[in-house]
């Protein structure tokens, strides 16, 4: 078992899964993984299935050169998006694996959240393509390593309201004016 980039804060309430040297594009997978980060497990699975069916798009934020625009990206406050089906399928398999690990450890599957997900480049695989005039060009693939951890979300406890009303926050300019008024009155 290898070392993960980020260990969970509470190992008893979390589970992990990873895949190495996966034959899926690094750039597409990185953008897809970033989209599901901090999502609840069920929502992340539904999102990835919708991406495969082209009902929701993945926003492309960093690797967006030459990527076309789509209306579905408005949901993410951007205009650039795609539907990387193969990346979504690989991530779905990893989420399924992590869910099985959580079930084995006795965690509540409905309260799991994607706490950490990271995509790293794997060594490129080299093939060749034949060109005109007897030349040969490289035909590379960019596989990746994926690791993720799911954490059981804790109950949110609301803070008790105090009897004192909250003080209104004043800007520096208004505070200065109040001080000047007090100085004039004295």
UniProtKB/Swiss-Prot annotation:
Coiled-coil features, chain-numbered ranges: none
GO CC, one annotated term: cytosolic large ribosomal subunit
Ranges of Basic and acidic residues composition bias in the record: 177-186
Gene Ontology molecular-function annotations: structural constituent of ribosome
DNA damage recorded as keyword: no
Record key words, sorted: Ribonucleoprotein, Ribosomal protein
CDD domains tied to this protein: Ribosomal_L22 (cd00336)
GO process terms (BP): cytoplasmic translation
Region (Disordered): 160-186
InterPro entries in the record: Ribosomal_uL22, Ribosomal_uL22_CS, Ribosomal_uL22_euk/arc, Ribosomal_uL22_sf
Signal peptide interval: none
Domain of life per record: Eukaryota
Keyword Ribonucleoprotein: yes
Pfam entry (one): Ribosomal_L22
Protein family according to the UniProt entry: Belongs to the universal ribosomal protein uL22 family.
Name by which UniProt lists this protein: Large ribosomal subunit protein uL22
Organism field: Aedes aegypti
